Curated annotation (Swiss-Prot):
GO terms assigned for molecular function: chlorophyll binding; electron transporter, transferring electrons within the cyclic electron transport pathway of photosynthesis activity; metal ion binding
Source organism per UniProt: Cryptomeria japonica (Japanese cedar)
Subunit structure: PSII is composed of 1 copy each of membrane proteins PsbA, PsbB, PsbC, PsbD, PsbE, PsbF, PsbH, PsbI, PsbJ, PsbK, PsbL, PsbM, PsbT, PsbX, PsbY, PsbZ, Psb30/Ycf12, at least 3 peripheral proteins of the oxygen-evolving complex and a large number of cofactors. It forms dimeric complexes.
Protein name from the UniProt record: Photosystem II CP43 reaction center protein
Membrane-traversing stretches: 69-93, 134-155, 178-200, 255-275, 291-312, 447-471
Domain of life according to the entry: Eukaryota
Chain positions with Phosphothreonine modification: 15
Residue sites binding [CaMn4O5] cluster per the record: 367
SUPFAM superfamilies tied to this protein: Photosystem II antenna protein-like
Free-text function comment from the UniProt entry: One of the components of the core complex of photosystem II (PSII). It binds chlorophyll and helps catalyze the primary light-induced photochemical processes of PSII. PSII is a light-driven water:plastoquinone oxidoreductase, using light energy to abstract electrons from H(2)O, generating O(2) and a proton gradient subsequently used for ATP formation.
Encoding gene (name): psbC
Keyword presence, Kinase: no
Length: 473
């Protein structure tokens, strides 16, 4: 029977330039992988693979700490965060650290502490990574059976899955505890333009929480991305954290059922492909969340969403022209529709002009001016507050668009500030990374399935011309 990890299938064309650079158990002859194949050389060396993973975690945490301190060093409190190219400080501010009413940054010391803590953590992880990569045991199965594993051991693999799920659940509950007990988090919907508050009235009703999953992803429905209040958001984390923890305990205590043993491929490369698929889904969801959602990603820190900037422009000019004597309720625009206000097909009063396509935007600076049937004309005439005018004028000139001409009616040139919105950065990067992770999933899933089926696509390595050529060195 052909073994799953036959080295034959791996022999690459390349030969090593310098044989002295190799380490036993990590060279081409013993693993079937050349040095540039990275961690693939460590598939069957659990101790060394542990070192690679811990070192990788150290690099990630080092980036977080160093970038955090870099952003703190460059931060100017007088300017909004989204004008300064920051992507880490907005996350810390959203968690309620260093923020006052209206999203004003009142204290940067918590951000400094965060950066230093991450740097110290990265040093610990870096040391652990180097230790396990160079000094620690090559395999863990003999000395530390709890941490050892064989890729084909289905029971052990689901136990490891369970441990990971419990850790994810604990992470979800960390946010819950911060929101409930440790100072609260920033709520962009707090009266008067946003503030930090403790969440006291969690939404735990399953029909509300799981109702988000049943929503359409299109239009005003918006699937889970449509969450617009912190009670639902934190309640969702309670549910998700509980499901992850109980699911983790389940996977630790049980063995995979027969249907699961048959359905999945049980190899290291298969697990890699499953993980890449999960990360891809996370990336796509994060992309949509940061682009469309101004509750989880408050506009005070990340800048306005596209629809928000467009509606802000309509509002800003309505305010200006109303002061100059325009009758905003009846003025006609160039197309014969309302210039400032019009009715949606279902009868709500909405902003007129190109921004009509964004009529279902909800934003904290606009909602107080709505009545039971859309925008309230009497409120628009009498109740507009200075903070709403300031905020909409600011958002109008900071659309998350990279265009030289008008898009969705937003002035993106001449009157606008030349900047790239963190929403643009974060949405684009997560979409691109999500896409590449999906391609990686397809690639590794295909290889894993082919190996499990006992065949490989490709040329027969025994008859390659390079094997008869003189080695380069």
């Amino acid at each position: 029977m052909k073994t799953l990890y036959s080295l034959r299938r791996f022999y690459p064309v390349e030969t090593l330039f310098n044989g002295t650079l190799t380490l036993a158990g990590r060279d081409q002859e013993t693993t079937g992988f050349a040095w540039w194949a990275g961690n693939a050389r460590l598939i069957n060396l659990s101790g060394k693979l542990l070192g690679a993973h811990v070192a990788h975690a150290g690099l990630i945490v080092f980036w977080a700490g160093a970038m955090n301190l870099f952003e703190v060093a460059h931060f100017v409190p007088e300017k909004p965060m989204y004008e300064q190219g920051l992507i880490l400080l907005p996350h810390l501010a959203t968690l309620g650290w260093g923020v006052g009413p209206g999203g004003e940054i009142v204290d940067t010391f918590p951000y400094f502490v965060s950066g230093v803590l991450h740097l110290i953590s990265s040093a610990v992880l870096g040391f652990g990574g180097i230790y396990h990569a160079l000094i620690g045991p090559e395999t863990l199965e003999e000395s530390f059976p709890f941490f050892g594993y064989v890729w084909k051991d289905r029971n052990k693999m689901t136990t490891i899955l369970g441990i990971h799920l419990i850790l994810l659940g604990v992470g979800a509950f960390l946010l819950v505890f911060k929101a409930l007990y440790f100072g609260g988090i920033y709520d962009t919907w707090a009266p008067g333009g946003g503030d930090v508050r403790k969440i006291t009235n969690l939404t735990l009703n399953p029909s509300t929480i799981f109702g988000y999953l049943l929503k359409s992803p299109f239009g005003g429905e918006g699937w889970i991305v449509s969450v617009d209040n912190l009670e639902d958001l934190i309640g969702g984390h309670v549910w998700l954290g509980s499901i992850c923890i109980f699911g983790g305990i389940w996977h630790i205590l049980t063995k995979p059922f027969a249907w699961a043993r048959r359905a999945f491929v049980w190899s290291g490369e298969a697990y890699l492909s499953y993980s890449l698929a999960a990360l891809s889904v996370f990336g796509f969801i994060a992309c949509c969340f940061v682009w469309f959602n101004n509750t989880a990603y408050p506009s005070e820190f990340y800048g306005p969403t596209g629809p928000e900037a467009s509606q802000a422009q309509a509002f800003t000019f309505l305010v200006r022209d109303q002061r100059l004597g325009a009758s905003v309720g009846s003025a006609q625009g160039p197309t014969g529709l309302g210039k400032y206000l019009m009715r949606s097909p279902t009868g709500e009063i909405i902003f007129g002009g190109e921004t009509m396509r964004f009529w279902d935007l909800r934003a904290p600076w606009l909602e107080p001016l709505r009545g039971p049937n859309g925008l309230d004309l009497s409120k628009l005439k009498k109740d507009i507050q200075p903070w709403q005018e300031r905020r909409s004028a600011e958002y109008m000139t900071h659309a998350p668009l990279g265009s030289l001409n008008s898009v969705g009616g937003v002035a993106t040139e001449i009157n606008a500030v030349n900047y790239v919105s963190p929403r643009s950065w974060l949405a684009t990067s997560h979409f691109v990374l999500g896409f590449f992770f999906f391609v990686g999933h397809l690639w590794h899933a295909g290889r894993a399935r082919a190996a499990a089926a006992g065949f490989e696509k490709g040329i027969d390595r025994d008859f390659e011309p390079v094997l008869s050529m003189t080695p380069l060195n």
